């Protein structure tokens, strides 16, 4: 970080201390109280710990800087001042132009009912973001701590100014686009009622976190130029346990939710995903010598519209190789397992495929996977109560359930699954290494893949 920016951040923190009110000021408008939102109807695998009481007199209002200057220092100072039992109110418009490490939070509420916008300074951010080793993820701020409740009450906005990032990446694949929101070690609490707009990359990366409720979110990112707004996952979970994601609307590209390695005990319910790649397990097995685990997922009552695949499991083959893409990917060779995953009550609306099991993810041709079957074993996976329509992209094929070998999949079941093709032809399901007696698929049923 440059000298001028460092000085600016320190000055911002000092100025912010003057702007923070620990006791509510007379005449101050009443801020939105934290909503009482509970997991519903499916309950979490483990009870989410109760929060501690907040001090109603420990309230920090953040006054934005003049002329759209950097508010990072003011925001951090307020969070430090009213940490441990207080509430921070962000009810105005704020610009964040320098990185924020917020992994110190404890027993705190953050009422973000205004707007936080990240400065579109591409060159600066590429040199000054927080880096994660997993898939080159990075972000301009990182949240973490214990018993944190971040809420927007339906009005709060986090805006990533994604358009210049998408435009730049269209002509230069080396541009590293930051993720809009990252948790790293967030244990206990909730994220609710926020509008996430124009993320340069994934919208949310839930990493190394636990006992977290995410609800009533509104995600929208679309490009206004010829540059494609790609890789805009709604949520990616990684090394996280006991998370509920529910009752949200997502309009974007790529996975609506993606369960990355070591995602366990997760509920996803009541989502409406439009234009996505589905609710996906994986991709897994893309790093050699690593053991990926995904287990105990319940995915309930979600509507998938205009997606490539509604329910998707994607794992790499068993040997590392250069894969398709520009620039080419390198992946595969990892091991692990996927266990106890249920997709229940999923409505398909104009989708390419309803179900896709792909143990040859990223490969150039299928023979590569037959020679090197995936080391990620899929067991106890259930698809049930799925119906709706396809868009004809693969007509009459409605789904693909393809395993790499007879040993890499076990107890894959389908119950009451049907899809209506746009042509009116009976649905066909491409299957390989499946116990077809366990598959209640509508239409023709399984055909050879």
Swiss-Prot record:
Glycosylation: residue positions: 136, 172, 208, 262, 274, 301, 306, 340, 365, 416, 421
GO molecular function, one term: galacturan 1,4-alpha-galacturonidase activity
Disulphide-bridged cysteine pairs: 256-273, 403-409
Active site: 254, 277
UniProt PbH1 repeat ranges: 240-261, 263-283, 294-315
First and last residue of the signal peptide: 1-24
UniProt keyword list: Cell wall biogenesis/degradation, Disulfide bond, Glycoprotein, Glycosidase, Hydrolase, Repeat, Secreted, Signal
Classification via SUPFAM superfamilies: Pectin lyase-like
One GO BP annotation of this record: pectin catabolic process
Subcellular location: Secreted
Catalysed conversion reaction: [(1->4)-alpha-D-galacturonosyl](n) + H2O = alpha-D-galacturonate + [(1->4)-alpha-D-galacturonosyl](n-1)
InterPro entries documented for this protein: Glyco_hydro_28, Pectin_lyas_fold, Pectin_lyase_fold/virulence
Family membership: Belongs to the glycosyl hydrolase 28 family.
PANTHER family membership: EXOPOLYGALACTURONASE X-1-RELATED (PTHR31736:SF14), PTHR31736
Protein task: Specific in hydrolyzing the terminal glycosidic bond of polygalacturonic acid and oligogalacturonates.
Protein name, entry field: Exopolygalacturonase X-2
Source organism: Emericella nidulans (strain FGSC A4 / ATCC 38163 / CBS 112.46 / NRRL 194 / M139)
């Amino acid at each position: 970080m440059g000298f001028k920016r460092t000085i600016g951040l320190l000055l911002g923190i000092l100025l912010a201390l003057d702007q923070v009110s620990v006791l509510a000021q007379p005449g101050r408008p009443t801020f939105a109280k934290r909503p009482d939102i509970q997991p519903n109807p499916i309950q979490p695998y483990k009870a989410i710990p109760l929060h501690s009481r907040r001090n109603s007199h420990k309230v920090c209002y953040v006054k934005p800087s003049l002329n759209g200057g950097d508010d990072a220092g003011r925001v951090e100072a307020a969070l430090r001042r009213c940490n441990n039992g207080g509430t921070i109110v962000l009810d105005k418009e704020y610009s964040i132009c320098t990185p924020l490490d917020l992994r110190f939070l404890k027993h705190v509420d953050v009422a973000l009912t205004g707007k936080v916008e990240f400065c579109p300074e591409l060159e600066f951010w590429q040199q000054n973001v927080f880096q994660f080793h997993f898939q080159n993820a990075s972000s301009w701020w990182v949240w973490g701590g214990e018993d944190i409740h971040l809420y927007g009450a339906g009005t709060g906005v986090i805006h990533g100014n994604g358009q210049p990032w998408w435009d730049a990446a269209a002509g230069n694949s080396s541009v590293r686009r930051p993720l809009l929101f990252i948790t790293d070690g967030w244990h206990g609490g909730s994220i609710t009622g926020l509008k996430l707009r124009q993320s340069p990359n994934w919208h949310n990366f839930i990493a190394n976190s636990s006992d977290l409720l995410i609800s009533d979110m509104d995600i929208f990112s679309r490009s206004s130029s010829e540059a494609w707004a790609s890789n805009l996952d709604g949520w990616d979970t990684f090394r996280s346990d006991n998370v509920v994601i529910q009752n949200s609307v997502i309009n974007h590209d790529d996975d609506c939710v993606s369960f990355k390695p070591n995602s366990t005990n997760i509920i996803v319910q009541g989502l409406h995903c439009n234009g996505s790649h589905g609710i996906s397990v994986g991709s897994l097995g893309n790093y050699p010598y690593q053991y990926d685990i995904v287990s105990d997922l319940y995915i309930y009552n979600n509507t998938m519209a205009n997606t490539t695949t509604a329910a998707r499991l994607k794992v790499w083959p068993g040997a590392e190789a250069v894969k398709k893409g520009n620039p080419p990917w390198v992946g595969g060779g990892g091991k692990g397992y996927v266990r106890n995953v249920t997709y229940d009550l999923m409505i398909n609306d104009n989708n390419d495929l309803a179900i896709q099991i792909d143990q040859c993810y990223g490969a150039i041709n299928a023979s590569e996977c037959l020679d090197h079957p995936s080391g990620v074993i899929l067991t106890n996976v259930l698809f049930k109560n799925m119906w709706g329509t396809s868009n004809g992209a693969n007509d009459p094929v409605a789904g693909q359930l393809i395993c790499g070998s007879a040993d890499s999949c076990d107890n894959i079941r389908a119950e009451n699954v049907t899809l209506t093709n746009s042509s009116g032809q009976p649905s066909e399901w491409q299957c390989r290494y499946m116990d077809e007696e366990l598959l209640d698929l509508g239409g023709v049923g399984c055909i050879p893949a």
